Amino acid sequence: MNYKTFLAMCLATALCSCTNTDYKKEFTNIIDEISSPQYYGRSDYANGDINAAKYIIDYISDIEGITPMASELTTPTPAYPPYKSAVKPASEGRWNDIDNADKYLPYLQHFQIPMNVMKGDMAVSIDGKALRPTFDFTAKEFSPSCHGTYPIQSVPDSIVTNEHFINYLNSGKLAGKFAVINMAKYCTLPAHPFERYKPYLCLIDSTKVGGIILKSDELIPYFKARSYFTTPVPVIGVDKSFPEDAQNITINIDSKFLPNHDCHNIIAYLPGTDMGTDVITLIAHYDHLGLMGRDNIFYGSNDNASGTAMLCVLAKYFSTHRPKCNLQFIWLDAEEANLLGAFYYCQNPTIPLENVKLVINLDMIADDGDHLATECSENGMSELEIIKQINDNNDDYKPFNIAIQELTDNSDHYAFDQAGVPSIYFSTEGSFLKDYHSPRDSNSNYSADNFNRLFSLITSYIKMK
């Protein structure tokens, strides 16, 4: 049997299976569930993250052949990824208070990280005019609490240099004031691209500066990647509409630093038919940004309830269409906190990493259009070529425009690449990308139009292995 004939058979099988079973409907049902308000952006607020994990485990534990696989090969040890927080082993944490916890614990890998959270007030006004959170301003994730009214003073671009910047901020000229800084100019300061804020903003003397306003052409989205520390003063982002003649800021922001926030990867396993040791690992992060103030929930339908849902339905599909190779499914926590769940897993794997022939990371896959953003490790390129051939020879669906980009630390595959594991990342990019890291990434703003062809692409590839 030649390659194209075998490929056609794989595609036909995937298409038939996808047609006969409504995996697409299950895909959207899962997204809609774990992106609903009661999960609070899959954060620790009201145990939204725990409840999301319970939902995932309830789903996969009903799948025949799926087994838990959260026992590490050795005694767990901390991970120390560069330019990120340390990630330490932990106990069950909040799971100790969950009913029927024994059902869930075998699937869970526990770890802990420091995290600054914002669950209370989130209000900013300029000269008496209220700014809208996530539209007109965002709070940087490392900001401490702040309540009061302060004068505003702009910092000249000429001051924003390595020689003058911190000395000027701490000179006393800005005592009790919020300093407006041109973000584009700030980004020219010497710093590692993974750690642009900490080397400068953590040096600020809070008795000499009241706070920082970073002004950019477009509003900086909300992140959690740098929530493992706090700066001495609050930092907010605004866009170019921020008035040049602003005089005063009234700010009410509540934050709380959690030195030992408990997190939990979910790990499951499906043995293949050849009884070998080779494994394909499918990953997706199930956490999201949670809250930026009590009234601003980041629901995360596309990012990344979509990848979470795809892993669930792939597990169900392969339970009745067993491939030759073994499959591992990992729903990772703390991706938004700088990929820390993935780094912890790579430090404490549940199967030897050398047995993993490929990691496929699905992150933000509920967008429309034909663009399939792809990143691939050097040692995964041969597998990507196979996937590209499947894509290009698919007579049942229009091929994706597979756009290969530089591999960066933008999602969990990066941690596996750094551990030497062949890794591929997929993300669909279309009209809903504009809602990235905002409360608008919700159940009203995602698309399942690409589900069938991405499902077919992944299942066809795995059937060939």
Please tell me what each predicted stretch does.
Residues 11, 15-22:
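Bacterial Sec-dependent signal peptides at the C-terminal "C-region" and cleavage site
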Residues 22-47, 63, 88-89, 95-96, ...:
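N-terminal capping segment at the start of a domain
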Residues 23-37, 57-59, 63-67, 190-192, ...:
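Catalytic-core environment of secreted peptidases
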Residues 37-47, 112, 154-155, 184-194, ...:
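Second-shell loop/turn segments in exported
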Residues 40-178, 184-189:
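Noncatalytic luminal/extracellular "stalk/propeptide" segments of secretory-pathway proteins
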Residues 143-164, 216-300, 320, 324:
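Soluble metallo-hydrolase cores and metallopeptidase-like ectodomains found primarily
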Residues 316, 433-465:
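His/Asp/Glu-rich mid-to-C-terminal helical/loop segments that flank catalytic regions of hydrolases
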Residues 323, 332-435:
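Metal-dependent peptidase/peptidase-like ectodomains
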